[in-house]
């Protein structure tokens, strides 16, 4: 949401309007934790959700970090920032059973990226924030 709105905890969502994509992880998690008085406006897809927020139809936006990062890059005039983490849901890389050499190589590349700081640099560049704690 905009830097002008102070949101430090879930309780601060009371009295606010929040855009969310109907049925998405963010909608489900927000519905669980939003206090009474939070108005969740649901939209059919990410594009409609982001468009509604950008157009000022809601005060806040509940979405994944990759969607939020692109929205913030494309709309710097909104002066937005990350507010709260609804759920930490990392992405994973799937490797077919029996592909032990490939899995080992992928894990080594990820470990090297974590150690060198390259993963955090890429996350900062593309998502506007560090990668955070990654699973082992």
Per-region residue spans from a language model:
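Periplasmic-binding protein-like
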Residues: 69-111, 129-136
């Amino acid at each position: 949401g905009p830097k002008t709105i102070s949101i430090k905890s879930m309780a601060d969502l009371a009295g606010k309007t929040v855009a969310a994509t109907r049925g998405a992880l963010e909608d489900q998690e927000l519905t669980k934790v939003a206090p009474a008085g939070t108005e969740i406006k649901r939209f059919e897809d990410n594009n409609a959700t982001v468009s509604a927020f950008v157009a000022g139809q809601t005060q806040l936006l509940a979405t994944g970090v990759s969607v939020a990062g692109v929205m913030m890059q494309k709309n710097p005039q909104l002066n937005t920032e990350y507010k709260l983490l609804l759920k930490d849901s990392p992405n994973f890389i799937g490797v077919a059973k029996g592909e032990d050499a490939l899995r080992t190589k992928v894990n080594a590349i990820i470990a090297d990226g974590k150690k060198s700081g390259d993963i955090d640099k890429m996350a900062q560049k593309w998502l506007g924030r560090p990668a955070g704690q990654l699973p082992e």
